[in-house]
Amino acid sequence: MVAQINLKDVRNIGIMAHIDAGKTTTTERILYYTGRSHKIGEVHDGNAVMDWMEQEQERGITITSAATTCIWKGKKINIIDTPGHVDFTVEVERSLRVLDGVVAVFCAVGGVEPQSETVWRQANKYFIPRVAFINKMDRVGADFDHCLAMIEKRLRANPVAVQIPVGSEAEFAGVIDLIEGEMYAFDDATLGQEVERREVPTEYKERFTAARISLLEKLADFDEELMEKFLDDELISSATIYKALRKATLALELVPVFCGSAFKNKGVQPLLDGVVNYLPSPLDVKPVEGVDKDGVEVSRKADPSEKFAGLVFKLMSDSFVENLAFIRVYSGTLKQGDKVFNPIKGKQEKIGKLLRLHANKREEVKEIVAGDIGAVVGLKFTTTGDTLCEKEAQIILESMEFPDPVIGVAIEPSSKADEKKLTESLAKIALEDPSFVVSQNEDTGQTIISGMGELHLEIIVYRLLNEFKVAARVGTPQVSYKESIQRSHSAEGLFEQPTGSSNQFAKVVLEIEPLERGAGIEFVCEVDEKQIPAEFLGAVERGVVDSLDSGPLVGYPVTDVRVRLVGGAYHEEDSTEMAFGVSASIAVRKAASEADSVLLEPIMSLEVITPDEYLGDAIGDLNKKRAKVVGVEVEGDLQKLLAHVPLSEMFGYSTSLRSATQGRANFTMQFLAYDVVPANKAETIIKKIRGI
């Protein structure tokens, strides 16, 4: 069991990267060198500790965020190893929301890849300090300097090398520490556990000196004491450099860069030193902010004696317990048996067991204190993004935003007996994964499951069949289209109906107008209480939003519109929330149906890496898919082709790219935006959906 540790000695970090950059392998080495595991697990052998799901072991990728805790030099490090595949980007988003620092892992050959950029943007959004680890220095084509330059150019970051590699590819022998001025060699016989300190090799002294001066010059811009010593040519102690570098890292001014080969057991211990030296403790992070029950801004500092506040950032159904809720405690102390309040749901929850996790293993603890991460058993009402707090000291912390799904498949039970089981299992998975949506096709009655990509849905179907033991039939993947409008239109909704001894009455006048792509739905109230009392406005907005779930064109959700409430009427005796909800629904449906509807489709950002001789074939193949080529970059002896392409054209793209390039190209893609489907294509899609 991990002993209680002072908050200044806690690090809550995530390990993040593009797929195949070596995140999980790096994490496995961290667990081994910190004594958390007693043998090294390997991704390629299917026995990595952090990849514990069966599908993770089969596919050799991380699918769900796995959490663990280890100790390094007296510091407790809570680690979340996250997926690198774009289909599971929601796992990264919700992990970053509760982390204080990030280790960004880059492949020394591939450098900054598409998902690296996505993760970096997500970390920027939450103002998270980070260190970088340039991994796979032993691979053919490894280039430390090029990777460093890519971090600066592609990520618009300010990287600063704190190490340089000794050799590369098969000759990679260790690293030179630019602060301590010595080389670290990692003993193969002890799987890198024994680290030998050596003098800087003679042939590297010139490069070492230049790299150290570059480090000091960058630091001098952010630390006056160091600048004075540097300009006066005084001796600068290691302690002064560590202090200045920590300050610049926490201020998001610099990113310390390490290097190594996790697979070859080289460079991981210095990276761990970097985590404790440069990444923040909960005390270094500003107090978490939220609003109280009256909407007044309040904050809570990381102090176990403060009033309790925590954020649930993930739910997981489990074969051992019904519901496992991952929580970051921001203030106060959470104890077994506590009664806490969920201000989002307006419900009280009783805390069952509290757990500290190590991948899929767990140990029971009596309490989770401010600044720490753990899991709770027994919550009945709480979902991802909810705040838990004390009822007498309520606070609602900022929740999380999750992307809309872009692809769906129809699913149906194999028999009547499986119907209930399928419904319950889908509900459990949807509770765990906010980017997974279950809906019903009103015309066909089919159940549609939607997610972030083909792999995402493949994994969910696999879990249904194997983990939940549901017998089901699955259709072919379908694109999740949306609808929007091209011009403004207004309409009136009147609901007048006798119910028993009284009448129901409500009148609403709405105007709908188009917004720019990505704007979502805006509702604006432009009436006064004489027309519609304030108590009914919530019902009007709900009626509008609910109705826009199904558009007039072919029933897809309507987006990128502003709905203005411009008029209405009520009766003192006969008006109700229900009546106003119905009248709003009538009005918005009328207005949208007359506003020149258009079909929107998901556009993907595509990156193809191909040998030079196949570039023309790859472009020709994309031209058949309505793709827009936006750039070509040289990557060593390869070409990087950048394009925007409709998702509907990308089914089976692996096969067509393999055919066009004789299997020598590969690609990655991620969601970019929704855009209007060309009229001729839209007509074909609409006819197909309507069965014409």
Curated annotation (Swiss-Prot):
Record-stated family: Belongs to the TRAFAC class translation factor GTPase superfamily. Classic translation factor GTPase family. EF-G/EF-2 subfamily.
HAMAP family the UniProt entry points to: EF_G_EF_2_B
Cell location: Cytoplasm
Lineage: Bacteria, Pseudomonadati, Thermodesulfobacteriota, Desulfobulbia, Desulfobulbales
Cellular component per GO, a single term: cytoplasm
Keywords: Cytoplasm, Elongation factor, GTP-binding, Nucleotide-binding, Protein biosynthesis
Name the record gives this protein: Elongation factor G 2
SUPFAM superfamilies in alphabetical order: EF-G C-terminal domain-like (SSF54980), P-loop containing nucleoside triphosphate hydrolases (SSF52540), Ribosomal protein S5 domain 2-like (SSF54211), Translation proteins (SSF50447)
GO molecular function, one term: GTP binding
Gene3D superfamilies for the chain: 3.30.230.10, 3.30.70.240, Elongation Factor G (Translational Gtpase), domain 3, P-loop containing nucleotide triphosphate hydrolases, Translation factors
Domain annotation tr-type G: ranges: 8-283
InterPro entries in UniProt: EF-G-like_DII (IPR053905), EFG_II (IPR041095), EFG_III (IPR009022), EFG_III/V (IPR035647), EFG_V (IPR035649), EFG_V-like (IPR000640), G_TR_CS (IPR031157), P-loop_NTPase (IPR027417)
Biological-process GO terms, alphabetical: ribosome disassembly
UniProt superkingdom: Bacteria
